[in-house]
Each structure stands twice: as structure tokens, then as C-alpha cells.
Regions:
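Short beta-strand elements in bilobed, periplasmic/extracellular small-molecule ligand-binding domains
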Residues: 49-63, 168-171
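Short, well-structured alpha-helical segments in soluble
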Residues: 69-81
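Glycine-rich, N-terminal phosphate-binding loop of Rossmann-like dinucleotide-binding domains
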Residues: 90, 193-194, 215-216
Length: 265
């Protein structure tokens, strides 16, 4: 497996050359509130998009904005012909429904792919899948285990891997420990997106040939970013955190925007 940072940089360079500065693409990021973690993610996304020559707009809303007021802003972006696509930075304040927000975003402007009618695939599973595909990973007939069943990662990841002819099992909070051990022991590919540090650790017997993609984002007591997996698992490849699936997600955001532009043309 190629180093993920090197892979992402090479793909971004190729996208920049493809766009060649001669494009009218514009992405807008809508951010509610001023949480430092979200600020960091937004800064990174802006940096990525600017590096490949895409114009950026940032709409910052106060944390106290009402749901209706936010939805009105999104509806304006839906009809703004200068905007190729946009995304709403998550998480949102508790008084705002992510489901309602996702349903308002027009499918042909949905960079994140969270609207049920969107052609785009949510960025994290798309990024993971595309990386594995570009690494010539042999999906067909192999056993995949996904830990987590969110609409953002687990469920769309399940569809991608199933469509690639893998035998896919989804583990979640109601899966017994006995079943978890069994499926993990036989897994060729493990995608971990549980949102809990240490969910996959060295207490489990894993195949030495297994590939582990750690999508988790957690912070330890020292405030350092860590994944859902214990480090240095005895497998063939384990994506790092940081510097792994987060980079793949950000790359997929760019690729989704380009795909939207191509579809809309």
C-alpha cells in the first residue's frame, strides 16, 4: 500500500493539472458555530480546494442561528448559479436537525453526498474505497468487516464493498463479543468507524494479511488526535491517524465537487 499522504498529494497534483486554472468551479462551506475542531477541518478543506485551483466561499453562522434561518441560507445556495456545490460542516448544534439540513441540500449541489437522492457518495467511504481500488486491492470474494453503521460511513461503505463483490459484515453496539471475535478473525478488510478509541485492539486475533482502515476521530487525554484502533496492529496494513482516512476524505470532497460539475454540464 502506498503512503496515504504521498498518494493524496499525487492525486491533488493530477487534479490541479486537469483543471489547469481554467474552471469556474466554486465550492461553499457552511459552518455553524466556532468550535476549534470544526475550524481546523474547515481550514484544511479550504487549503485543499485552493491548492487545486477551486474558488472557495465560507458562510459562517452563529451557533444560535435557528434551524429555519439556516435552511433559508441553504436554499439560497441551491439557486445560486455561481456555486458548483456546497457542504455543511458537521457536527451541528443540537437544536438543528442534520436530517432536515441534508434533505434541503439539492442533490446536484451536494458535495458530501448526504442527501438520499444525491449521485455523489459520502466522502469518507468514497475516499477509502477509491484508495483501495487505486492500490489494486482485490475486493471480489474477500471478507470485509465494517465496525459502525452510521449513515455517513458504515452504511454507504457497506454498499460500496458489496457492489465490489465482497462478503460484508457490519458490527455495531448490539453485536455480541463472541460474534465480533469470529468475524474479525476471518476478515480480509476491516473498516473501523465506531467513533470510540480502542474498539479494535490487539486482544482480537486478526489475519496477518488483513488491511485495516481506521476512520475514527478521537482525542486522548493529552488532546492528541487518535483513531478507533490500537496502534501497530499485527496486520499487513493499517491506515495511520492522523494522516490517513482524514486525508482521503478531504480528497474525495474535491473529487465529488468535480463530479458534480461534470454531471451538471
Amino acid at each position: 500500500m502506498q503512503n496515504i499522504k504521498e498518494y493524496v498529494e499525487a492525486k491533488k497534483l493530477a487534479l490541479k493539472e486537469q483543471l489547469n486554472g481554467n474552471n469556474n468551479l466554486k465550492a461553499v462551506i457552511v459552518q455553524v458555530g466556532d468550535v476549534e475542531a470544526s475550524n481546523r477541518y474547515v481550514r484544511n478543506k479550504i487549503k485543499d480546494l485552493e491548492e487545486v485551483g477551486i474558488r472557495i466561499g465560507l458562510v459562517k453562522c452563529p451557533e444560535t442561528i435557528s434551524e429555519d434561518a439556516l435552511l433559508d441560507r441553504l436554499r439560497k445556495l441551491n439557486i445560486d448559479q455561481s456555486v458548483t456545490g456546497y457542504l455543511v460542516q458537521l457536527p451541528l448544534p443540537k437544536h438543528i436537525s442534520e436530517e432536515r439540513v441534508n434533505s434541503v441540500i439539492y442533490p446536484w449541489k451536494d458535495i458530501d453526498g448526504f442527501n438520499a437522492l444525491s449521485k455523489t457518495v459520502p466522502a469518507t467511504p468514497l475516499g477509502v474505497y477509491t484508495y483501495l481500488k487505486d492500490m489494486n486491492y482485490e475486493f471480489s470474494g474477500k471478507n470485509a468487516v465494517i465496525i459502525g453503521r452510521s449513515n455517513i460511513v458504515g452504511r454507504p461503505m457497506h454498499k460500496l464493498l458489496l457492489d465490489a463483490n465482497m462478503n460484508v459484515t457490519v458490527l455495531h453496539t448490539k453485536t455480541s463479543e463472541e460474534d465480533k471475535k469470529f468475524y474479525l478473525e476471518h476478515a480480509d478488510l476491516i473498516v473501523v468507524a465506531a467513533g470510540k478509541a480502542g474498539v479494535l485492539n490487539k486482544s482480537y486475533k486478526l489475519k496477518e494479511t488483513a488491511v485495516v482502515m481506521d476512520v475514527g476521530i478521537n482525542f486522548n487525554e493529552e488532546g492528541k488526535l487518535i483513531g478507533d484502533c490500537e496502534k501497530d496492529l499485527p496486520v499487513a496494513f493499517q491506515s495511520p491517524v492522523p494522516g490517513g482516512c482524514g486525508l482521503l476524505t478531504r480528497l474525495a470532497v474535491i473529487e465529488n465537487l468535480v463530479a458534480l460539475a461534470n454531471d451538471n454540464n
